[in-house]
Amino acid sequence: MVDNIIDTDNYYAIVYTYKTIGLSKLYEHYIPEKDLINIRFSDTQVSLLQTCNRVELYLYTKDRNKINDILSKLNETHGKDISSNAIVLRGKDAINHLYQVASGLDSLAIGEYEILGQIKEALTSCKKHSLCNEEIELLFNAAIKVGRKVRSLTNISKGKVGIYSIAIQKSLEVMGDLTDIKIAIVGAGEIGSKLAFMLKNNGARNLTIFNRNLDRALELSNKFGYNAELLDFQKVNEYDLVFIAINNSNPSQLRLDKPKLVIDLSVPPVVYKTSNVIYLDDLRVISDNIILNKREDIKKAEAIINEEIQKFESLLNNYNMNRLVSRFMSEIEWVREKEVDRAFNEILKNYADKDNIKEIIDKMTYSLIKKVFSPILEDLRKDPNNKKQIVEYLIEVFQNGQFSDTKTQKIEKQ
């Protein structure tokens, strides 16, 4: 049996999301990049998709026990049991889940676009650290294509669907015109950058970016023509509209009572809940109402996903067949080269023009193999599902690159 065949049953997903454990506890499951490198086993591929809504590991392994080993490693690196509330998906279920995520169906805000970029970044990261190979790459690239297809064939992403778009929309409802409002963004990371861009498009002019790292705040503020300051929540409290999006490892909360509106997107929240504060969970309620209005689009998207899962299986079948054919032809080429050398040595006994003789034999044998095997291989490629075993059998006959001694002796006698 050939070892490098891709099997859908070898795909796994270890899932923690806002749906399964809640946003308030999700941060406890975050996996630092250095820990991801440590938990990965040599014969297991892994990619981490980690956002404010989810912590998900996508894996490819032929050994089911490796999943339990990785869960144990997660417990070890976190210093507590986090494996008991993990959802483990396998095969088509894991593929379906990633497709749902890529399509925006499993997002806090239905149809959001941001997730496609996050999936692409997850793939780039795992390749950069040599944590995954083509098996994961094929799946992630397919998921990105599915996400784009769903958005092009449905209205799932039409309107204000992204969580940050909903946050901006809520601020417009409460504050009205943003042109002269004093606005603060706490955090200069990916979310802070998106908020700054969207607020710029909505007319915000008097905006300051606060961050623990002033250089990062300056870099972002200069991009949009805003102000930048080192993070000081006493100063932040003097603004009319405040957005907060920072990594918060401290469960204690502070109060911001002067702003008219505070939208805290941090997990867990930074600010104590009062009447002027909106959490990520509050935006989720708005998102749920959007979902109710997009039920028909969700049905269409799910139908597309089911169809694309079948296409992915066909893609793998064709991919596997091409691998088998390539392997088979390499075995044939090995035999051909050996026969050329043997014939060449025989001819040398009677002829002196070595270069011309070997070129003639080489062209002759190559042409012979091509003529013999091209019709066979074309027929095999037409039906990869049912004829894969034939190619595997042919490879086994050659016994990983060489005829057995018994077969070789029989051929030489002939």
UniProtKB/Swiss-Prot annotation:
Record site: Important for activity: 97
Record bears the keyword Oxidoreductase: yes
Gene Ontology annotations of biological process type: protoporphyrinogen IX biosynthetic process from glutamate
Source superkingdom: Archaea
Job description of the protein: Catalyzes the NADPH-dependent reduction of glutamyl-tRNA(Glu) to glutamate 1-semialdehyde (GSA).
Misc. comment: During catalysis, the active site Cys acts as a nucleophile attacking the alpha-carbonyl group of tRNA-bound glutamate with the formation of a thioester intermediate between enzyme and glutamate, and the concomitant release of tRNA(Glu). The thioester intermediate is finally reduced by direct hydride transfer from NADPH, to form the product GSA.
Domain text: Possesses an unusual extended V-shaped dimeric structure with each monomer consisting of three distinct domains arranged along a curved 'spinal' alpha-helix. The N-terminal catalytic domain specifically recognizes the glutamate moiety of the substrate. The second domain is the NADPH-binding domain, and the third C-terminal domain is responsible for dimerization.
Protein name (record): Glutamyl-tRNA reductase
Top-level taxonomy: Archaea, Thermoproteota, Thermoprotei, Sulfolobales, Sulfolobaceae
